[in-house]
Amino acid sequence: MGFNQSISVTKKIDVNKNKLWEFISSPGYLNYCHPFCKKNKIIKWEKDNHSDILEYLNGVVYIRNFIKWDENKGYTLLIGEKNKEQSKVIWEIIENGSSNYLKITVFPYFLKNYPKVISYIPYKLFVTPKLRIYLKSVLNGIKFYLINEVPIQRNKYGRHSWFS
């Protein structure tokens, strides 16, 4: 499964690493922090087998299958509609001195079978800006929830044309 492009966004999260990991590794956590999530339902949440369903506000339903789980550091998952193309997503906790950061990197399935020279312009003009806005909203939602311990309002950081 080769991917031509990736988009990463990193956000400083003002909580200790254990609290951050405990939250992002807990079942159903997107229900509390994801600004475009209508429902986050668990399929399986066991030691070496994690998968869930993410239903967006606009009714799009994605399945997340976790393919790598690195305790207290992060995980890698595949996400997409059932029986369709999937994007690869890496969630990483980064420690830098006394600060903790959460980094999300998405390797979108869009145009992945095209040569980079052909997919470059659509990515730069369309996919990258949309995904960057999406990832910033997700990370802001996680930070908001962990600091305030109050579930986030839907579309808190603005509507998103792909998911609202």
Label each region the model flagged:
Residues 19-24, 30, 66, 77, ...:
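Hydrophobic pocket/interface hotspot
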Residues 6-8, 59-64, 85-90:
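Short, surface-exposed coil-to-beta transition loops
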Residues 81-137, 144, 148, 153-155:
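Beta-strand/loop substructures that line and gate deep hydrophobic ligand-binding cavities in soluble
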Residues 50-57, 76-82:
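Short beta-strand segments that buttress and anchor functional surface loops
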Residues 152-164:
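Charge-rich (especially acidic), low-complexity segments
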Residues 62-69, 75-85:
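Helix-adjacent hinge/juxtasegments
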Residues 1-44, 163-164:
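Hydrophobic ligand-binding cavity/cleft-lining segments
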